[in-house]
Amino acid sequence: MDARWAVLLALLVASGGGGGVRVCAAGAKGANWLGGLSRASFPKGFVFGTATSAYQVEGAASTNGRGPSIWDSFAHVPGNIAGNQNGDVAVDQYHRYKEDVDLMKSLNFDAYRFSISWSRIFPDGEGKVNPEGVAYYNNLINYLLQKGMTPYINLYHYDLPLALEKKYGGWLSAKMADLFTDYADF
């Protein structure tokens, strides 16, 4: 692997880890340790960003009307996850999204790709909408835009509402295509 790309990969991994990690802007004067790598090394319009999935970062697993997902069920079975960890709190982005976005902005990211928790919008996977879940994502998107960052949204990251798994057998059911369409159209 070319050394410049290895450094970029290390920067992206370090910056995505949070935890107070600070990285110099890749275009900063005197950043010779980057081997000349800077934003100018990429095509005009290249978007620098970071990405997460709802279950891995949001936390607030049973807060404000969110229903359980298949990941909640799986992670709460002792021994399924190392150290019996789960996403109940995670990094608590649900309550700390402004801090997270501010950190992304301070690292000079242009965009943030995140997934929406289907069970935060539709606690039962279908039917009644959870207005508090909708408000959370509206607030996150609006704050990203306010900070000049582009939101990229992933509608599904392997966190099917548990109610749909139990009622229809999950993705093995042909009914899921219609249910996902309803969710996406919302």
What are these regions (language model features)?
Residues D2-A3, G18, V23, P78-A82, ...:
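Catalytic cores of glycan-processing enzymes that make or break glycosidic bonds
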Residues A51-S73:
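Short, solvent-exposed beta-strand-terminating loops
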